[in-house]
């Protein structure tokens, strides 16, 4: 095994399947052999049996739809704010210096602290959940966009200047296109992070939602239902991650 060796597609698929099989086999051994109590690690059978109960008793599909809506809205709003502002901050250092004293410390804000804050500001209705997801996403997306712009190679800027490009042409035809692939990757990362916030977003007054479903299951000590809810979140997260990754490859094929 060489450092950073290239892996063929066929071998990559085999390694992925092997990894899944090993982890699933370990889960089966630990649970079916009762090496770990089922209140800690339910068996795959118990988790599978939880899905019909969640579907009929807790509206699993509707909850998944509500969570997807909330995460998507927070994600889109964060992108609408972070991308233009990040492009400005990455392109013009004075703007970055002006904004940095306020925006940089926000990266260290505990996300859980935003729950009571957004409740005070927006109440406990739907707006609070979307604003919470927006705030939790935008504070991390913004510096990634700034970094994407700053990482565009100066050689391209110097070449454009030498060829007589104006400042607006350099920004519109060099900096922005050059930073878009990294911004696309940042969006993919932040989509995943958004799903990690959904439990907190739906902890208060959410009749439907995967986070609400998991919170209720936790209060009832239904560990199998918690696992089932988590698996649904993981599934949706993986699918949306794949969709963004495919879109990035199609939009920025020239990058590779």
Give the label of every model feature segment.
Residues 2-10, 32-76:
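Periplasmic/extracellular loop-to-transmembrane helix junction in inner-membrane transport proteins
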């Amino acid at each position: 095994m060489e450092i950073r060796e290239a892996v063929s597609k066929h071998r990559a698929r085999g390694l992925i399947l092997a990894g899944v099989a090993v982890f699933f086999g370990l889960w089966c051994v630990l649970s079916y052999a009762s090496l770990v109590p089922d209140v800690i690690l339910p068996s795959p059978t118990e988790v599978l049996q939880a899905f019909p109960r969640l579907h009929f008793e807790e509206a699993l599909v509707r909850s998944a739809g509500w969570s997807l809506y909330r995460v998507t809205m927070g994600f889109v709003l964060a992108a609408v704010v972070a991308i233009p502002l990040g492009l400005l901050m990455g392109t013009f250092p004075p703007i970055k210096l002006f904004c940095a004293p306020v925006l940089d410390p926000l990266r260290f804000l505990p996300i859980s602290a935003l729950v009571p804050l957004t409740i005070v500001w927006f109440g406990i209705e739907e707006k609070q959940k979307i604003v919470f997801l927006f705030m939790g996403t935008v504070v991390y997306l913004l510096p990634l966009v700034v970094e994407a712009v700053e990482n565009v190679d100066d050689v391209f800027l110097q070449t454009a200047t030498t060829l007589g490009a104006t400042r607006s042409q350099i920004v519109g035809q060099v900096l922005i296109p050059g930073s878009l692939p990294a911004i696309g990757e940042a969006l993919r990362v932040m989509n995943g992070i958004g799903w990690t916030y959904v439990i907190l977003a739906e902890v208060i007054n959410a009749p439907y939602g995967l986070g609400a479903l998991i919170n209720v299951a936790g209060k009832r000590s239904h560990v199998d239902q918690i696992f089932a809810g988590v698996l649904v979140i993981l599934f949706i997260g993986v699918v949306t991650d794949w969709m963004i990754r495919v879109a990035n490859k199609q939009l920025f094929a020239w990058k590779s």
